[in-house]
Amino acid sequence: LRGLREKYADKLHIRIGLEAEYFPAYLGWLREETERLGIEYLILGCHYDTTDEQDAKASRFGGSTSTAHGRRYAEQVVEALETGLYRYLAHPDLFLNRMTAFDADAEKACRDICAAAARLDIPLEYNMAGLTLQDRPDGSLGYTRDEFWRIAAEYPVKAIVGCDAHAPSELDVVPAIEEKKAFLHSLGIPVLDTLPGLE
C-alpha cells in the first residue's frame, strides 16, 4: 500500500487503515505494530469476546442469542473506545445478528454504545453489508438495524457509511448508500465522508 501511495501520489490520496479487535492483553502489541507498519488509523471491530488461546470456546458476538453476551459486547466496545486507539466503530449493532427479539437488554446495550460514542466523539459505522443479513427464515434479527439507529439519534453521534470488503459481491449494496445516508440524515444523524484528521 505504501508503494501504491507513492506511485499514484499525483492521482490518489491513499490512507492505510485496519479493522482490529480489542483484546486488552494484546493492546500494547497492537499499538506497536500500528506504529511500526505506518497504519494511519484503526477501526474497532469487536467480533469475539476473547482470544482462542485464552478460551478455546471464545464466542463470536454476531453468533450468539444470549442477552448476557449482548451486554458483554457493549461493555467490551465501551472499554475499547475509551482506549483512544480506534477512529470509529464498525457494525456497532453486530451483537443483534442472531438474536430473535429486540428487548430491553438489547436496547440498553445499544444505549451504552451510543452514549460512549457520543461522549468520546467516535463515529459509528452504518454497515451496508449487514443489510444482506436481514429477514432470515429463522427469525434472527440480523444487522444493520433501524432500531439501533433510532436510539443513536437520541445521542449526539456521527455516522460513517461503510461496506465490508470480504468478497466482491458485498459491493452489490453500494447503490443503496445514498438511500441509507438519507435515512441517517432524516434521523438527524450527521454522516461523515471522511474521518476527522484524515482529510
Predicted regions and their residues:
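Charged catalytic cores and adjacent phosphate/nucleic-acid-binding surfaces used
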Residues: L96-N97, A101-E199
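Extended substrate/RNA-proximal surfaces in nucleic-acid metabolism proteins
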Residues: L1-L120
